C-alpha cells in the first residue's frame, strides 16, 4: 500500500460532500471550502510479519472568513456525526479508500481555529483526526 493511494482515497471520500474541495496534499492556493489531508504519524508492525500499519492523518477543513456567520454554521454541519455534509460520514463512506486500506475511522474533531493562508484574510477551520488501517 502506498501513502499516496491512501491520501487519494481520503480526498475522493471528502469530495462526496457537495461543494467541498478535497486536497490529498497541501495546496498553494486552496479553493474554499477545502479539506486538506496531512500525514501525522505512522505506527509500523502492528501485527505479525508487517501485516498491519496504522496511518494517522489530520484533515483540516477551511470554510470561510473568520468573522462570517455562515462559515461558522458550515463548520457545525461538517462536524456533525451524520448527514450529507458530515466529514465523518464522508470519510467513512468507503472504508477501503478505493482498495488501499482495511478500514478508516474518524476518531475526533480536535478544535476550531483561525487559519492564515497568507492571502491577507483570516479563515476559520477545524481539524479532524483520522486513523487508517492498512498493510
What kind of feature is each model-predicted range?
Residues 1-31, 41-135:
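Charged, amphipathic alpha-helical segments and their flanking helix caps
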Residues 37:
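Two-metal-ion RNase H-like nuclease active-site motif
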Amino acid at each position: 500500500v502506498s501513502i499516496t493511494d491512501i491520501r487519494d482515497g481520503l480526498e475522493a471520500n471528502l469530495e462526496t460532500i457537495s461543494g467541498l474541495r478535497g486536497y490529498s496534499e497541501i495546496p498553494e492556493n486552496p479553493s474554499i471550502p477545502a479539506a486538506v489531508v496531512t500525514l501525522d504519524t505512522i505506527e509500523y508492525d502492528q501485527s505479525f510479519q508487517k501485516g498491519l500499519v496504522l496511518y494517522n492523518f489530520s484533515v483540516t477543513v477551511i470554510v470561510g472568513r473568520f468573522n462570517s456567520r455562515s462559515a461558522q454554521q458550515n463548520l457545525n454541519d461538517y462536524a456533525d456525526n451524520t448527514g450529507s455534509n458530515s466529514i465523518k460520514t464522508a470519510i467513512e463512506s468507503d472504508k477501503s479508500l478505493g482498495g488501499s486500506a482495511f478500514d478508516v475511522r474518524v476518531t475526533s474533531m480536535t478544535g476550531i481555529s483561525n487559519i492564515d493562508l497568507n492571502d491577507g484574510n483570516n479563515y476559520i477551520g477545524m481539524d479532524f483526526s483520522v486513523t487508517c488501517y492498512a498493510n
